[in-house]
Every structure is written in C-alpha cells, then in structure tokens.
C-alpha cells in the first residue's frame, strides 16, 4: 500500500498551497537531470523563517517526470493530489513497481506541490539547496 511522507527540507516540512513557488524548470534529457528553482514561503515551513527563501532542487537519474497545473490536477479522479505536504516522498507506489519491472531500477517517487503546479518525479536521487 502506498505511503506518503513529508520530505524534511533544510527548513523542515512544508505545508500549504502558498509554501512553494516554482520559477524555473530545466530538463537535461541526455543527463536524465531535472532542475527546479524558485522560492519557499519561510512562514509555512516547520522551522519557520521570515520572508521567502530561494531554493534549487536537482533530481538525477530521472525516469519519470510529470507536471500538471494544480487546479486541473485537483479535478482528476485517479490521483490523490490533496494528501500530504507540499513536498512528499511516496513509497510502495504503482509507479515505482512499474519502473522496477520495466527498467530494473529502484527509484524514489517524489511529489512537489507548488502554488501553480504539481510536479511528480521518479528518480534515483535528489539534492535540495537553500
């Protein structure tokens, strides 16, 4: 059964639609690398800080990348986009099982819910810099 766990960022777990803003998306296809840049609303972090905090997320060994506008995602019946925090790691999901079967890879399944979009990634690893 799938499990959802909030990712602990350098300023703690993030909650709320206004917690993460996404300003830049870059996919390097040949390197299987996805880079996301934007700002975090520090007041919505578990370890609250004043103002907005810039972030960079680098996902490596990306085998799955899906980005959907938030309001559209909330109207889809096949996904539970409303659960969890603003940045979650999901385990025991059908996506992970499919990738393991098709490519023999044991990856991470991550979901980032920003103000405007939801980004879902199946990757080997990631690094967050604040």
Predicted regions and their residues:
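Surface-exposed, interaction-prone regions used to assemble/regulate multi-protein complexes
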Residues: 1-130
């Amino acid at each position: 059964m799938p499990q959802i766990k909030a990712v602990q960022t350098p300023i703690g777990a993030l909650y709320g639609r206004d917690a993460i803003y996404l300003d830049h998306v870059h996919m390097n296809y040949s390197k299987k690398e996805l880079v996301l840049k934007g700002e975090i609303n520090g007041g919505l972090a578990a370890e609250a800080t004043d103002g907005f905090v810039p972030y960079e997320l680098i996902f490596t060994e990306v085998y799955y990348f899906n980005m959907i506008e938030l309001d559209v995602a909330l109207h889809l019946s096949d996904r539970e986009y409303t659960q969890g925090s603003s940045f979650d790691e999901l385990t025991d999901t059908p996506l992970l099982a499919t990738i393991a079967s098709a490519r023999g890879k044991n990856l991470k399944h991550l979901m980032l819910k920003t103000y405007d979009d939801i980004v879902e990634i199946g990757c080997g690893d990631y690094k967050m810099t604040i």
